[in-house]
Amino acid sequence: MKLQINLCALALLLMISFTAMAQSKTKAKAKAKKEVAIQLYSVRDILNKVDNKDGKCDAAYITLLKNLAKMGYTSVEAANYNNGKFYDRTPDQFKKDVESAGLKVLSSHCTRGLSKEELASGDFSSSLQWWDQCIADHKAAGMSYIVAPWMDVPKTLKELDTYCAYLQ
């Protein structure tokens, strides 16, 4: 009888342990969601057709963002920073648009090459001012990163030296 009680107690402990393990695995699976961002440059053909000018917000633009979220994307990288705006939306508007679609703003890729005058003179202060505004706008849009996707190829060693100083 004592053996039977011990075996029953052992079986009960094993059942409780396995049940707890199964529940913790189920909770872990439910919590696990991959973070996957999409570079909006990859859907530029669609975005180039939207009309967000004059402060209005094109329905096709919002639909695209919502569809990206439905596909499983969790964040976006912008690729259209121009005159202080992203896709003709102010940084605050862009952030609200993206977040209302269920996505996060992660990053942007943009750059500013040096003009011929800047390369010749070595004075790139106007480009640095542009970057100051660019960084402020990206922060306002909620971005954590800015990627420079390309750089003009310098034609001379002097131009290369100027670019090196500029990029520092």
Set out the residue ranges of the language-model regions.
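Histidine/acidic residue-rich metal-binding segments in metalloenzymes
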Residues: 168
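Hydrophobic alpha-helical segments and helix pairs
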Residues: 138-155
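Bacterial Sec-dependent N-terminal signal peptides
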Residues: 1-29
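Generic structural signal for short, solvent-exposed loop/turn connectors between secondary structure elements
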Residues: 12, 152-159
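N-terminal pre-domain/capping segments
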Residues: 18-141, 158, 162-165
